Amino acid sequence: MIADQIRKMAAGERIPVWGISPVSKMADELPGHRPDDLLPGTRSLICFGVPVPRAVYQMPAYGPDTIWRSQNLNYRLLDTLAIRFAALLEENGASAAPVFGCMPLGVNQKGVVVGYLNQIRMGEVTGIGVIGKNGLLINSRFGSRLMLGAVLTTAELPEMRYPETSESGCPSGCRICVDACPVNAILPDQKKVKIMHCLGYTARTPLMSKSRFLFLKAFNPQTAARYMNLKAFDEHTFHICSKCVALCPYGG
């Protein structure tokens, strides 16, 4: 059974949280960003997460540098695992495609930088967490520190998750992330982030000209996205702010 092989691989790779859900749970995503747009005939979603260690976000010295390196190494791990899960599914006769953790990105019709699929939403529908006021996936064990990888497949897999969890979500009165955000990018009632406000403040991309990116985005969003993916991939983007993750009291 393919599900047993997925479970075995997840255990062997020490993936602490993962889940599987039917694709119908993401039927309300925007056109162009639905699972079927990437892999026609998708029936099942697989999403999994690995955390950045808590202490990385608490380091008084070299904190941003250590966060930067930790996140980049986790992205490589997650992307590699997504490819391996996809290969496992194809060995069993299904089609499967990885959904990478960060890059490549696109620019949608509103001029907003977005992933090809909403991985945070995938994490929620597969049951490994809920979306918090900071717009991130929060988990009762790892808080906001989970980084995500995912796979789409035409295999019809049983819905499951590991471990079984019941998430209460953010306390109603908590505004720690909202008040800490230096550019007021967090919309707690909508559980969303004004991503261009956030990136405009935190992202440092020494190899990418922001003025050129904005020019391309105005006239050819697809070219702008390709330029960004080539110039700001992996280590080529440095974030100076992670307060919405570091200060989140939810979970561990």
PLM regions and their residue ranges:
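Non-catalytic, usually N-terminal nucleic-acid engagement modules in DNA/RNA processing proteins
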Residues: 1-78
